[in-house]
A protein has these predicted regions:
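Bacterial N-terminal signal peptides
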Residues: 7-15
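Surface-exposed or secretory-pathway low-complexity segments enriched in glycine-proline
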Residues: 43-83
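Extracellular/luminal low-complexity segments enriched in Ser/Thr/Pro
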Residues: 83-93
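Residue-level recognition of well-ordered beta-strand positions that form the cores
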Residues: 87, 101-103, 118
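Positively charged n-region of N-terminal signal peptides that target proteins for export
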Residues: 1-4
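A short beta-strand micro-motif common to beta-rich folds, especially ectodomain repeats
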Residues: 93-106
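Extracellular interdomain linkers/hinges and stalk-like, low-complexity segments
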Residues: 20-59, 107-122
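Hydrophobic residues in beta-strands and at strand termini
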Residues: 64, 75, 88, 119-121
Length: 122
């Protein structure tokens, strides 16, 4: 059985439709392998990736390793309920990007994974 870590998106904009303000393409990765995804967010908006763990394994560390140029990315929530938040700069529309790493141990795999997030700011 392979250890899978899935990231799910939640919008933190109260009262706004989730897909209109913030949407992240679904993706899955294994510890020790890299992947990428795309986030769609409104100009000036905030989007959060909640890291959802499977029933086994553990996370050793999470860090934003490459900062966005037209917004900011941050790690919040600790190891128990980890999340990566992106806040776009108000008035900016266009492409942005950031990256973060997750280091952990699963049943069959362990290691550092880099997740690159391309951001489409509307």
């Amino acid at each position: 059985m392979r250890r899978i870590v899935t990231l799910a998106m939640l919008s933190l904009l109260s009262g706004a439709p989730c897909l209109a303000a913030c949407h992240t393409d679904k993706f899955t990765f294994f510890y020790g392998s890299d992947t990428s995804t795309t986030m769609h967010v409104s100009s000036g908006g905030r989007c959060t990736l909640n890291i959802v763990l499977g029933p086994t394994g553990s996370i050793k560390s999470i860090a934003v390793t490459e900062q966005a140029k037209h917004g900011s990315a941050s790690y919040n929530g600790g190891i128990a309920y980890p999340e990566i938040a992106y806040q776009s700069s108000r008035g900016y529309k266009g492409a942005d990007a950031f990256a973060f790493t997750v280091d952990g141990q699963g049943i069959h795999r362990s290691g550092l994974s880099t997740i690159r997030v391309s951001v489409d700011v509307k």
